């Protein structure tokens, strides 16, 4: 009995010691994006596989804005004094994202077992509404009529995600202020859904459509160079995303190509003004489904036949981060 009490006492001391070293940081992130207009270019026959580029044909298509408040609670979990493992930690991060058309609480748990690896599990749930013609949440009425709005706080978007991240910095093996060539590569498995919407039915969330209940993937690679300047980082980001199974969408949308993999190429730069303030600037060249004919008066592309990848300049985005 005394032995058990002693072991419990030691466990309490260790636990208190670990949490006493924990760090808490609050982060406020403000995102804004501007989208110029780039109309789809129809070409070829349904059986073709035609790559194309859609030029800009208008100054304005849309804007996007949101604010995210987040708390990071970092618990040190060092496995030793080796540089690879002495910085190990578990970070617990509740967050709240607010946009003009959505409200979405989020929760993240990240574990860094070694300096160059990070594993993250996260969950999100949110609801949306319409505002000045922007649709926060809805499901497809028909390809001709587009999406119809769902009831806020009755229908909910949800996402569960598992992510692994590999990161490497040349500066870790070649010390110096100007040797920080960095690379990050990640792969995420996620399930997204909208309550009250039947499986196979397309839906829209945060004014972005062509989604359905089902398993998705998201992967990114970032190659960058960090400097001891206000312009801290310049780099190039590659993003890949899509649905694992075309059966996530109803069979009648098969010609639309449900399993299309979207590819984004994003030049980025990060301005770090001090330890608390930073600004990320990103431009995005993206790809979307190309079709052999124009959708005409239809509100969506779901009645069209996919016949290749179409590239276009999608947006310019700003993300301002303040931490304290």
In which residue ranges do the predicted regions lie?
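Transmembrane beta-strand segments of Gram-negative outer membrane beta-barrel proteins
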Residues: 21-41, 65, 88-96
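Solvent-exposed loop/turn segments connecting transmembrane beta-strands
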Residues: 59-66, 94-107, 113-116, 213, ...
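Outer-membrane beta-barrel channels and translocator barrels
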Residues: 74-78, 85-87, 112-116, 171-173, ...
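Bacterial N-terminal signal peptides
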Residues: 8-16
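Positively charged n-region of N-terminal signal peptides that target proteins for export
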Residues: 1-4
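Outer membrane beta-barrel
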Residues: 72-74, 82-132
